[in-house]
Amino acid sequence: VSRGLGDVYKRQVCSMSADKTNVMRILDQKKIKYKVHEYKESGAVSGVEVAAALGQNPKRAFKTLVTVGKSGNHYVFMVPVAEELDLKKAAKCVGEKNIEMIKSKELLPLTGYIHGGCSPVGMKKFFKTVINNSVLDIDDTIFFSAGKIGFQIETMYDELKKVIRVDEADIVVE
């Protein structure tokens, strides 16, 4: 199910406030144009499977990964769902000697999100965020989690940059 942009979507959401995530409320507050795509949650599903179910190009669908550096600082990386984060490249671009993925059980207390529903928007606190530079080659919208399993946000990258500070870098495995 895909919901449209602008006022039509806002009217629909008013009658479905239970479906509205914190991410959507933040985007509304910042007057960001976006669409919400809903999919049936059927257990553990990969980002590639979600993109396929919604008919999305996996190069435009991004997963949100949370890491911790040797310094103890946390970092957020957004990579296309079919790609893998290169930990060495990622560490270098944030000035760390090395980084590692945080443990799944640490995700909720740290970000407010669970595995499979982690969004770069609306985390409990701001973390340095880097998106793979392939986003610069996309002239269309991008997709990322709406902060709840079963929901994806679609918006232009320039719109996302109005909400979070994000840098671009080559951070995927070749």
Located regions from the model:
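Extended, low-hydrophobicity, polar/charged segments
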Residues: 13-174
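Single conserved hydrophobic/aromatic residue that forms the stacking wall/gate
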Residues: 1-12
